[in-house]
């Protein structure tokens, strides 16, 4: 199954908040859900999915392996624990959340362990997140580009990450954008507002439509039904060449996610 272009993010949402967000999203027609071991919400997401009554085969569930679980003896057991929490026998996609700080666990070791998890049927696809070009090169050397379903990276109108995107595309690696709305900063942008007014759309719809138009998957999160519903409509918005050019000009390498001790040396 190809990675859905549109899904629900759950970063920073926990307990009843995430349960409500996931149940509402599934009611509205969302079918892809993105979580991670470090979000500490896999069990709540699993509960929400169970309560929603949506059949498992209709869903596309992504989780991510945390850095403490990257070694070959920990990766698969940690994924099995995630599956228990999510109340499922498999996930559709498992990502390496961040590369191992200071190369404590080699890219080769964790990518091969992740590929083994795929061979065991614990995950249908595998991929990476927050990987730079040198790290993607190592991942490809370890398991082959055909086994890397996506690189999930911070990507917004203010951080268009063109080098990484171009390199990934050249090697057949799909891009998933997180932080697409730049923590809401881009929603206040005058250029975005003008495009939104022109299309009778919301700023969020414009930005999400732009990202999907570039071929990226998006996973916006929201706790409000109104926004969840509105974001979904971004899939029907077509931007023209003028709009795309205006958004391309907003790129200013404004990176919002770069945790000290965790972030690699960015391209």
Curated annotation (Swiss-Prot):
pH and activity: Optimum pH is 7.0.
Catalytic activity: hydroxyacetone + NADP(+) = methylglyoxal + NADPH + H(+); a primary alcohol + NADP(+) = an aldehyde + NADPH + H(+); 2-dehydro-L-idonate + NADP(+) = 2,5-didehydro-D-gluconate + NADPH + H(+)
The enzyme's E.C. designation: 1.1.1.-, 1.1.1.346, 1.1.1.2
GO molecular function annotation: aldo-keto reductase (NADPH) activity; aryl-alcohol dehydrogenase (NADP+) activity; methylglyoxal reductase (NADPH) (acetol producing) activity
Gene3D superfamilies recorded: NADP-dependent oxidoreductase domain
Amino-acid positions noted as binding substrate in the UniProt annotation, renumbered to this chain: 97
A GO BP annotation: L-ascorbic acid biosynthetic process
Ligand binding (NADP(+)): 179-231
Subcellular compartments: Cytoplasm
Keywords noted in UniProt: Cytoplasm, NADP, Oxidoreductase
GO CC, any one term: cytoplasm
Induction field: Expression is not significantly altered upon methylglyoxal addition.
Null mutant phenotype: The deletion mutant shows sensitivity to glyoxal.
Function of the protein: Aldo-keto reductase that significantly contributes to cellular methylglyoxal detoxification by catalyzing the NADPH-dependent conversion of methylglyoxal to acetol. It also exhibits fairly high activity with glyoxal and probably plays a significant role in detoxification of glyoxal in vivo. Shows broad specificity and can use aromatic aldehydes such as 4-nitrobenzaldehyde, 3-nitrobenzaldehyde and benzaldehyde, and phenylglyoxal. Also catalyzes the reduction of 2,5-diketo-D-gluconic acid (25DKG) to 2-keto-L-gulonic acid (2KLG) and could be involved in ketogluconate metabolism.
Family listed: Belongs to the aldo/keto reductase family.
PANTHER family (alphabetical): 2,5-DIKETO-D-GLUCONIC ACID REDUCTASE, NADP-DEPENDENT OXIDOREDUCTASE DOMAIN-CONTAINING PROTEIN
Assembly and interaction partners: Monomer.
Protein name, as recorded: Methylglyoxal reductase DkgB
Taxonomic source organism: Escherichia coli (strain K12)
């Amino acid at each position: 199954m190809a990675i859905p272009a549109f899904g629900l993010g759950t970063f920073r949402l926990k307990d009843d908040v995430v349960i409500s967000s996931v149940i509402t999203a599934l009611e509205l027609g969302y079918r892809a859900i993105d979580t991670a071991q470090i979000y500490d919400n896999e069990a709540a997401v699993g509960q929400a999915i169970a309560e929603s009554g949506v059949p498992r085969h209709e869903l596309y569930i992504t989780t991510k392996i945390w850095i403490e679980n990257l070694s070959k003896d920990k990766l698969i057991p940690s994924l099995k624990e995630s599956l228990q929490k999510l109340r499922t026998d498999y996930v559709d996609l498992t990502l390496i959340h961040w590369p191992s700080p200071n190369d404590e666990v080699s890219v080769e070791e964790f990518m091969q362990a992740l590929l083994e998890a795929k061979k065991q049927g614990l995950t249908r696809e595998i991929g990476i997140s927050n990987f730079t070009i040198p790290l993607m090169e190592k991942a490809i050397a370890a398991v082959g580009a055909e086994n890397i379903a996506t690189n999930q990276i911070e990507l917004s109108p203010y951080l268009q990450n063109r080098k990484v995107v171009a390199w990934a595309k050249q090697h057949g690696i799909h891009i998933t954008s997180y932080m697409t709305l730049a923590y809401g900063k881009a929603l206040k942008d005058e250029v975005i507002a003008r495009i939104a007014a022109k299309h009778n759309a919301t700023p969020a719809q414009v930005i999400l439509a732009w990202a999907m138009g570039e071929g990226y998957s998006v996973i916006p999160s929201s706790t409000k039904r109104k926004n969840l519903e509105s974001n979904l409509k971004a899939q029907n918005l077509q931007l023209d060449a003028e709009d795309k050019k205006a958004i391309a000009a907003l790129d200013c390498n404004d990176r919002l996610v770069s945790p000290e001790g965790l972030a690699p040396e960015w391209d």
